[in-house]
């Protein structure tokens, strides 16, 4: 793909946009209209003589010149509706519509909008009568000293007065003397806010907000923020005054609310949204919204963008920004300083020659032109703001020093510029500040907020003997008040194990707390103890309030269910101990029983006693390391529908079914005296837990045909090909607890258990157990599990699960967004698919395709080709990982590397690629452009086996796509992608199922009709 892009505008911002767009390998030419001397002839960049005010003529120009994308720099064309007009004419245009651009073009609209959507801003009133405005200024109960022209005034329509009289004079100048023309027909009078002013910008596709690093502009002409207001005399980025946490707050409470609000009001906002923000003592407040890049903010933000700007803009227009989030250069600062003409912002001289460009560029600086023109082959001044000099270095001080060198090199008569750009950041950075606990990664305020949120949850678990009041050093429990006379105490501690990993992958944290409580209170119930109180331990690297609150809310609800108090706990934030998003849990329960009620009563247990099994809710919290391994090898993801017969839920939800708590239902039965022992079936399964409550001389014989085995166990056994012993030693197999009772009382106890709403069965009996004999024998287990997962028809077992011949293990190689990867992921989730994706490899880090894979629970690897001397070494590294994952088939989905001969030969007949044309026509990387230039009416896409010659492998499937009149590379590409998403999965299914094979003679063989 080799696109042509048109940038609208003539300033330093537009030169910067053109410079950044020209860096894209997908862009072959950037035209700028009307442009300046810097964009006249600079590599891919040149100026275009086309009227930008006549939108019809502009649209025709774009069609004639095959422009793929129009990028609008200044605000005036946006307010004039250029985006809507070009879009209606079939030209892709980056920026908000005129309706959405009212956020900038009408300050009155913007203020009303912010009030409607609770976006923090200064107090204000709008006026069309100057007398009313002045009356408000003198009577307002806040300092009403900021006067703004409501319309567009080239960034200069704001006057910050020092007194009420000065504010009233500003009103007169704007409304009566028309200092800003029609823009001042309505004025907005605002509260004067105090604090640091910063610029926070974002890309948005109308849903997703991708924030940029915060910047700070310098509006006043002279050092020390003296002199008149200008369009901006310099900027730096990132602004250290805006911490990461504060930027998140600004994103959520300002930028995202604005985007969501525009969507709700029927004017979806797409493009750049710029919020000018004051950092007040009451938090960030919006001063103004702009609907485009600021100038000079653009000149310091875009040099820090690592991503392809063209790609980001196209993804934004496609509504796919979430899959192509921009990546920024970290641990670097950018500074830009504006050089202006003498007399600016008033009258100034034009036509003054500028020298020193080679010297500035030799310093490694970027010089962006603004008010410049070419005259007799020389660069001369033609505007108030003439040049911006941008330096990027590892820190702000170094960037400032480099920018000053460029200013010294560039010369024109009467040049003025500020020498103190960044002075506020310098002062902020040099301010003596001792380290805080938060600097080390521990946020005490967040911890306090968590305690405040969970206090009512814990309070609700109070019970006789304990009134919960979090915040003390320890908790107290009054055994006497709880009704105990001669008690023994029992305690137990446990965790949830790697079930946590699944909860974190599924982003489902509300049920894991019940697992923690259940594991502890069920253990002490085995001693006959009533659970009295519970304490939790939650540890993480970075406290996420919503996640932690969800976990602890689950713990509190489980404590209420168990009848114990959530007496306290510990939330430990330990930076660098855990990866982002991960946490660990541990619990501690204390219970009590009267001395004569202690279990197990070993002396009472005799041969012939009955074993009653109480149903589990599912897997409970054991065996999850094996479960995760089985899922990894299976054709399902955690987000896939659960196997047949397991309910209308995802596999992740099925596996996260919380552990059953037995204390409330079984404690009265245990206290009746009829129960001799209670075994909690936890780690070690049936084989290792029941013997823990039996005398050494006894064991048990169990019959699995007597109880209901949940279908999840059948799926695990079949998918993992697990042996009967492995099942019995790892899982509870449907029995969460076992009671030992006298044979003659079994029927009564079983009746009582069922009356307490527990599902239960007599599942076996106590038997004598000679030394060295198995203490638990389970008959009919594998038969019951397999029958349970199958349907019997005509005397044969038919699987009720999508168990089929072994599925092909697929690896997908990517370099970018991975839209075809998503199609492959979606198709292989189908239970009928003959393949499943086990690995995604990218030769580039931080690309959207990796995020797609991780969201689907697919392992990923990044193998950077730049770290290898040649293609063969890189391919060997890839091959090693493919072998590690036992890959059968390789799919190339936007993988931008030519593979070496040895690698291709090894994977001959097992490696698929998709090409965006009907091969053998239009080979190579710019197929769509070739199609359009050839004037054909049909194109399409082709899935083929990979051969050593590029795009020359045997064809598996093709799909035709019409070429329509007026198509651009972008529109044609989108239409072809739809076809790609259809036939790539279909071709993979053909190869994985064996329907299509590559013969030894290099020809396609169809094993069966499709």
From Swiss-Prot:
Residues binding N(1)-(5-phospho-beta-D-ribosyl)glycinamide: 818-820, 977-980
Residues annotated with Phosphothreonine modification: 682
Active site: 915 (proton donor)
Family: In the N-terminal section; belongs to the GARS family.
Domain notes: The N-terminal ATP-grasp domain carries the phosphoribosylamine--glycine ligase activity. The central AIRS domain carries the phosphoribosylformylglycinamidine cyclo-ligase activity.
NCBIfam families reported in the protein's UniProt record: purD (TIGR00877), purM (TIGR00878), PurN (TIGR00639)
Name by which UniProt lists this protein: Trifunctional purine biosynthetic protein adenosine-3
């Amino acid at each position: 793909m080799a696109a042509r892009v048109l940038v609208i505008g003539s300033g330093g911002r537009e030169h910067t946009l053109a410079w950044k767009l020209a860096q894209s390998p997908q862009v072959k030419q950037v035209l700028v209209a009307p442009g300046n001397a810097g964009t006249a002839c600079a590599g891919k960049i040149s100026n275009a003589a086309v009227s930008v005010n006549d939108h019809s003529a502009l649209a025709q120009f774009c069609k004639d010149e095959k422009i793929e994308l129009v990028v609008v720099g200044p605000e005036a064309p946006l307010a004039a509706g250029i985006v809507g007009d070009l879009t209606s004419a079939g030209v892709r245009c980056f920026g908000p519509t005129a309706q959405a651009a009212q956020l900038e073009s009408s300050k009155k609209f913007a203020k009303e909008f912010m009030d409607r959507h609770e976006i923090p801003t200064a107090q204000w009133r709008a006026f069309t009568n100057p007398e009313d405005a002045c009356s408000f200024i003198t009577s307002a109960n806040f300092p009403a000293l900021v006067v703004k022209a409501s319309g567009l005034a080239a960034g200069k329509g704001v006057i910050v007065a020092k007194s009420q009289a000065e504010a009233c004079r500003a009103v007169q100048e704007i409304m009566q003397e028309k200092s800003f023309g029609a823009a001042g027909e309505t004025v907005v009078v605002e509260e004067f806010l105090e604090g640091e002013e910063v610029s926070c910008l974002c890309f948005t596709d109308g849903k997703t907000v991708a924030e940029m690093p915060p910047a700070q502009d310098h509006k006043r002409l002279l050092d020390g923020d003296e002199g008149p207001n200008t369009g901006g005399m310099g900027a730096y980025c990132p602004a250290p005054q805006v911490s990461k946490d504060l930027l998140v707050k600004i994103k959520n409470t300002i930028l995202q609310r604005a985007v969501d609000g525009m969507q709700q009001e029927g004017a979806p906002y797409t493009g750049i949204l710029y919020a000018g923000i004051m950092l007040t003592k009451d938090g960030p407040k919006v001063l103004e919204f702009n609907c485009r890049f600021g100038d000079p903010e653009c000149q310091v933000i875009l040099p820090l963008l690592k991503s392809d700007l063209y790609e980001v803009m196209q993804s934004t227009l496609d509504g796919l920004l979430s899959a192509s989030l921009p990546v920024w250069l970290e641990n670097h600062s950018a500074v830009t300083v504006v050089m202006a003409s003498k007399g600016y912002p008033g009258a100034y001289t034009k036509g003054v020659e500028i020298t020193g460009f080679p010297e500035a560029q030799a310093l490694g600086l970027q010089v962006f032109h603004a008010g410049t023109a070419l005259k007799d082959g020389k660069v001369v001044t033609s505007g108030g703001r003439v040049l911006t000099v941008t330096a990027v270095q590892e820190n702000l001080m170094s960037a400032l020093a480099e920018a000053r060198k460029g200013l010294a090199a560039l010369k024109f008569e009467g040049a003025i510029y500020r020498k103190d750009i960044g002075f506020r950041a310098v002062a902020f950075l040099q301010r003596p500040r001792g380290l805080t606990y938060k600097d080390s990664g521990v946020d005490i305020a967040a911890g306090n907020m968590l305690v405040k949120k969970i206090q009512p949850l814990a309070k609700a678990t109070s019970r006789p003997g304990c009134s919960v009041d979090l915040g003390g050093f320890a908790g107290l429990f009054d055994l006497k008040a709880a009704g105990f006379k001669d008690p023994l105490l029992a305690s137990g501690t446990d965790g949830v194990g790697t079930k946590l990993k699944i909860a974190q992958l599924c982003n489902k944290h509300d049920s894991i707390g019940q697992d923690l409580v259940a594991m502890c209170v069920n253990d002490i119930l085995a001693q006959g103890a009533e659970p009295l109180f519970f304490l939790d331990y939650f540890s993480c690297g970075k406290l996420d309030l919503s996640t932690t609150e969800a976990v602890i809310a689950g713990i509190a609800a489980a404590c209420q269910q168990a009848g114990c108090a959530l007496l306290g706990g510990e939330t430990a934030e330990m930076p660098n101990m855990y990866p982002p998003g991960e946490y660990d849990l541990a619990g501690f329960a204390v219970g009590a029983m009267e001395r004569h009620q202690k279990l197990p009563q070993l002396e009472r247990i005799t041969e012939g006693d009955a074993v009653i099994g109480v149903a589990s809710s599912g897997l409970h919290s054991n065996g999850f390391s094996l479960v995760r391994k089985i899922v990894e090898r299976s054709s399902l993801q955690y987000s896939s529908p659960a196997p047949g017969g397991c309910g209308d839920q995802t596999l992740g939800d099925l596996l996260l079914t919380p552990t059953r708590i037995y204390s409330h239902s079984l404690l009265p039965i245990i206290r009746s005296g009829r129960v001799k022992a209670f075994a909690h079936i936890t780690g070690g399964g049936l084989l290792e837990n029941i013997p823990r409550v039996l005398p050494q001389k006894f064991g048990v014989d169990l019959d699995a045909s007597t109880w209901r085995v949940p279908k999840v166990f059948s799926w695990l056994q079949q998918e993992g090909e697990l042996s009967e012993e492995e099942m019995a030693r790892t899982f509870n197999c449907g029995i969460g607890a076992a009671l030992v009772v006298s044979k003659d009382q079994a029927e009564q106890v079983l009746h009582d258990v069922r009356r307490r709403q527990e599902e239960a069965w007599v599942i076996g009996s106590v038997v004598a157990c000679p030394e060295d004999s198995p203490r638990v024998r389970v008959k009919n287990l594998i038969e019951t599990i397999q029958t349970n997962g199958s349907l019997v028809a005509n005397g044969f077992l038919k699987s009720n699960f999508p168990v089929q011949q072994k599925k092909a293990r697929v690896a997908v190689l990517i370099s970018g967004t991975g839209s075809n990867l998503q199609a492959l992921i979606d198709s292989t989730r189908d239970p009928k698919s003959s393949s499943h994706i086990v690995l995604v490899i990218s030769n580039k880090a931080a690309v959207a395709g990796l995020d797609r894979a991780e969201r689907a629970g697919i392992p990923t690897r990044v193998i950077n080709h730049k770290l290898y001397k040649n293609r063969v070494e890189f391919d060997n590294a890839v091959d090693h990982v493919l072998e590690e994952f036992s890959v059968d088939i390789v799919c190339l989905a936007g993988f931008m590397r030519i593979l070496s001969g040895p690698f291709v030969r090894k994977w001959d007949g097992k490696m698929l690629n998709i090409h965006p044309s009907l091969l053998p026509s239009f080979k190579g990387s710019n197929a769509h452009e070739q199609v359009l230039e050839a004037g054909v009416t049909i194109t399409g896409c082709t899935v083929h086996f990979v051969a050593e010659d590029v795009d020359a492998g045997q064809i598996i499937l093709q799909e035709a796509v019409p070429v329509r009149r007026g198509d651009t590379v972008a529109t044609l590409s989108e239409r072809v992608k739809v076809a790609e998403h259809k036939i790539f999965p279909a071709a993979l299914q053909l190869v994985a199922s064996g329907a299509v094979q590559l013969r030894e003679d290099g020809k396609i063989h169809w094993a069966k009709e499709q």
